[in-house]
């Protein structure tokens, strides 16, 4: 920290001091906003008169951090709301799809045995009738 006696003794020298206070927040659109309050003091003479405060805002879009599988193809048009798909294999739709496939498999399996049963009964009927006649 620079005191008044340091300023008086080093009045001819040039001192540069930067103080940076950084705060960040994420808004609802998925944009990370970083706000920096930079307090720049360019010389000892300017330090007593006034300190210049600059506010810089950087916007970093989270959209660029998505996996290629999560980016939608817009043919050159920028998509303002990225679609984020779940990466887990066992999602609710997958479970429902699996249950539907199991039900379909059971129905097909029962139809197969029903058809096989009909075929065997017919075969037995014709074989028994041929031997009896």
Swiss-Prot record:
Mark out the compositionally biased spans (Polar residues): 63-79
Region Disordered, residue ranges: 44-79
Just give the chief location class.
plastid
Keyword presence, Plastid: yes
Kindly state which keywords UniProt assigns to this record, in alphabetical order: Chloroplast, Plastid
Q: A GO CC term?
A: chloroplast
Source organism, top-level taxon: Eukaryota
The answer to keyword Plastid applying to this record is yes
Query: Where is the protein found, in the record's own terms?
Result: Plastid, Chloroplast
Can you name this protein? Uncharacterized 14.6 kDa protein in psaC-atpA intergenic region
């Amino acid at each position: 920290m620079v005191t008044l006696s340091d300023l008086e003794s080093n009045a001819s020298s040039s001192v540069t001091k930067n103080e940076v206070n950084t705060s960040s927040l994420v808004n609802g659109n998925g944009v990370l906003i970083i706000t920096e309050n930079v307090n720049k003091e360019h010389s000892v003479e300017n330090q007593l008169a006034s300190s210049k405060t600059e506010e810089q805002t950087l916007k970093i879009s989270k959209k660029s951090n998505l996996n290629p599988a999560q980016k939608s193809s817009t043919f050159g048009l920028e998509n303002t709301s990225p679609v984020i798909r779940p990466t887990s294999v066992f999602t609710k739709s997958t479970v429902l799809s699996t249950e539907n496939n199991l039900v379909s498999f059971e129905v097909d399996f029962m139809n197969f045995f029903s058809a096989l049963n009909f075929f065997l009964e017919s075969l037995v009927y014709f074989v028994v009738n041929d031997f009896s006649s």
